[in-house]
Amino acid sequence: MQTVAVIDYGMGNLHSVAKALEHVGAGRVLITSDAKVIREADRVVFPGVGAIRDCMAEIRRLGFDSLVREVSQDRPFLGICVGMQALLDRSEESGGVDCIGLFPGQVKFFGKDLYEEGEHLKVPHMGWNQVAQAVDHPLWHDIPDLARFYFVHSFYIDAANQRQVVGRGHYGLDFAAALADGSRFAVQFHPEKSHTHGLQLLQNFAAWDGRW
């Protein structure tokens, strides 16, 4: 039976993610902060919620920045929400925070003056929204284009390499909803809260060989 490590650095909706992975038959799911267990896992999930400064402080304190770089190179790796944002170069949250830098780009604030067709939009972006599939990727298998996923975020990803953008969202402006590079896949939305389509994505991740 394969092992899926859900990285625990004290910030994240870990049990919901783990339960969803178990529900789709992902194998032995371990919530862990043990570097040895993470290194030995067949797949790795990197969730996150909260302020990026606090997240990055814990990630660096535990040495998980280098660990994430290492384990995401040679096995299926999934970043979720702030776990996705932490993979970028830098976030402008909290006055500016350097991140892990696996995906080139910036994490930017939606702003207080966000409008769509004259309507003022509330920030954070919270609720269901469509994701346009920019390319065909194994994790989109059996998920229709423009399927709706559940989002909660005040900061969005402005990707520097558009070829890595595999899913796009729109909330007053266009943003990267999903990024991919080799065995790495990352989503801004919460698949564990996104019902049928979110569970399908997790099931696809559990079956994915990491190739793209």
From Swiss-Prot:
Membrane spanning stretches: none
GO cellular component, one term: cytoplasm
Domain of life according to the entry: Bacteria
SUPFAM superfamilies reported in the protein's UniProt record: Class I glutamine amidotransferase-like
E.C. designation(s): 4.3.2.10, 3.5.1.2
CDD domains, alphabetized: GATase1_IGP_Synthase
Reaction equation(s) it catalyzes: 5-[(5-phospho-1-deoxy-D-ribulos-1-ylimino)methylamino]-1-(5-phospho-beta-D-ribosyl)imidazole-4-carboxamide + L-glutamine = D-erythro-1-(imidazol-4-yl)glycerol 3-phosphate + 5-amino-1-(5-phospho-beta-D-ribosyl)imidazole-4-carboxamide + L-glutamate + H(+); L-glutamine + H2O = L-glutamate + NH4(+)
Keyword Amino-acid biosynthesis: yes
Residue ranges annotated for the Glutamine amidotransferase type-1 domain, each copy included: 3-212
Compartments where found: Cytoplasm
GO BP of this protein: L-histidine biosynthetic process
Positions annotated as active site in the UniProt record: 81, 190, 192
Pathway(s) where this gene product acts: Amino-acid biosynthesis; L-histidine biosynthesis; L-histidine from 5-phospho-alpha-D-ribose 1-diphosphate: step 5/9
Pfam assignment, any one: GATase
Keywords linked to the UniProt accession: Amino-acid biosynthesis, Cytoplasm, Glutamine amidotransferase, Histidine biosynthesis, Hydrolase, Lyase
Keyword Cytoplasm in record: yes
InterPro entries for the chain: Class_I_gatase-like (IPR029062), GATASE (IPR017926), Imidazole-glycPsynth_HisH (IPR010139)
Protein function: IGPS catalyzes the conversion of PRFAR and glutamine to IGP, AICAR and glutamate. The HisH subunit catalyzes the hydrolysis of glutamine to glutamate and ammonia as part of the synthesis of IGP and AICAR. The resulting ammonia molecule is channeled to the active site of HisF.
Record note on quaternary structure: Heterodimer of HisH and HisF.
Protein name: Imidazole glycerol phosphate synthase subunit HisH
Organism: Pseudomonas savastanoi pv. phaseolicola (strain 1448A / Race 6)
Source lineage: Bacteria, Pseudomonadati, Pseudomonadota, Gammaproteobacteria, Pseudomonadales
Gene name, Swiss-Prot/TrEMBL: hisH
